[in-house]
Amino acid sequence: MAGLGIRLSAGDKLIVNGAAIEFETDAHLRLANQVNFLFGKQIMGPQEATTPARRIYFALQTVHVGTLEEREAALRDACYFIDMFAAETTSHIARNLLAQTKQAAETGHGYQALRLARRIIRHEDAVLSV
């Protein structure tokens, strides 16, 4: 059977097209259709969105795996957070990553936008720890 196989442990979380699933036992599942999903450490809770980069990631997470009703508002939020961060930062690296992230989000490439947002978080962490 074709598809993407995922192995999850008891307590792991998976979000598929807006549905949050928590596994009570170890499981192996196969996603046979094209779906938007995140699992494990890819999922950020609202209490973790404590910095500008993390707020961008959290909004993009909803763009990627939220319900249809949530996605439009989340994209507006993500673009707002990206624009605010870009206006405030002096880092050319951050501005470049922010521009790429916004373009990916606006063109429907949610997972790519999340990967770029993780790079922005790492950059932000490195700058703030100096």
PLM segments and residue spans:
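Terminal leader/tail segments of proteins
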Residues: M1-V130
